[in-house]
């Protein structure tokens, strides 16, 4: 399926838009996961068995029944098996549409969002709306693992190249958690930079850290959505390194009041939503 499919041409990304102030669920726009999975050959059978797109929404406001503005922060878990992912700008516009709309309480807003996102994604979605006080107590966290970024290597190419992972393993069997803060890709539609921290947890033949870092850096001028990049990394690692167990998790920096943090694994449970230094 070509990326010039009508489902991408109609997206609000990159287009001049008006901001609605009254609740409007029709602002949400789906992107079929098959657009990317077809190219990876995983439309029917994914190599990961656990996963979600974990969103944090920082800019949520509505009016209570007396017209007093309310604010909250939301944790949203969009199941990897949903038919669609949610296009981020449409999600922002949708959230903005709550601003001048009255709701009875937190629960009414949470249930409304969950219902609308399930309908758009065509799959399971969990929404947890939190008072700001909950986040006041939240610490800046870091992802556990060895950082592979401080290597004295020369980089001359920034074009995506999965072949950096060719012959990337030794015969030594290990369990490793690896972290890189150098993940950068570009939005598929607008070419805006997307900055992320990548976490890889695997059991299997030891992966060469230099080859892995060169592979991660090769995303630097690559155009794909966050969710698609993580699934591509998972598939490439399974193809070249063939680990027995694998988790790929990326936490991207915030844009438009939203951060997107895709998690894919074949052995680990979903993590709690946390916050890194760059988020």
Swiss-Prot record:
The active site is at residues 187, 194. One of its GO terms (cellular component) is cytoplasm. Substrate binds at residues 86-88, 226-227. Pathway: tRNA modification; tRNA-queuosine biosynthesis. This is NADPH-dependent 7-cyano-7-deazaguanine reductase. Belongs to the GTP cyclohydrolase I family. QueF type 2 subfamily. Pfam families: QueF (PF14489), QueF_N (PF14819). InterPro entries: GTP-CH-I_C/QueF, NADPH_dep_7-cyano-7-deazaG_red, QueF, QueF_N, QueF_type2. GO terms for biological process: queuosine biosynthetic process; tRNA modification. NADPH binds at residues 88-89, 255-256. It comes from Haemophilus influenzae (strain 86-028NP). Gene3D superfamilies: 3.30.1130.10. Disulfide bonds: none annotated. It is found in: Cytoplasm.
């Amino acid at each position: 399926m070509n990326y010039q499919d009508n489902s991408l041409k109609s997206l609000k990304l990159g287009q001049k838009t008006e901001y609605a102030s009254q609740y409007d669920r029709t602002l949400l726009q789906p992107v079929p996961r098959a657009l990317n999975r077809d190219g990876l050959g995983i439309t029917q059978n994914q190599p990961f068995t656990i996963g979600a797109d974990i969103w944090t929404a920082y800019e949520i406001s509505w009016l209570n029944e007396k017209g007093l503005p309310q604010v909250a922060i939301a944790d949203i878990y969009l199941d990897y098996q949903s038919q669609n992912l949610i296009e981020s700008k449409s999600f922002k516009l949708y959230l903005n549409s709550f601003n001048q709309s009255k709701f009875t309480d937190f629960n009414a807003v949470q249930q409304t969002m969950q219902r609308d996102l399930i309908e758009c994604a065509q799959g399971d979605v969990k929404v947890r709306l939190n008072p700001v006080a909950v986040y006041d107590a939240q610490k800046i966290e870091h992802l556990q693992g060895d950082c592979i970024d401080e290597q004295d290597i020369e980089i001359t190419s920034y074009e995506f190249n999965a072949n950096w992972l060719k012959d990337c393993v030794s015969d030594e069997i290990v369990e490793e958690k690896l972290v890189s803060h150098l993940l950068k890709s570009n939005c598929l539609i607008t070419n805006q930079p997307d900055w992320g921290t990548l976490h890889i947890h695997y059991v299997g033949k030891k992966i060469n850290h230099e080859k892995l870092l060169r592979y991660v850096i090769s995303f630097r001028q690559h155009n794909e959505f966050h969710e698609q990049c993580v699934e591509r990394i998972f598939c490439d690692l399974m193809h070249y390194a063939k680990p027995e167990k694998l988790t790929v998790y990326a936490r991207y920096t915030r844009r438009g009041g939203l951060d997107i943090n895709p998690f894919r694994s074949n052995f680990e449970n979903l993590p709690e939503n946390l916050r890194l230094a760059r988020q």
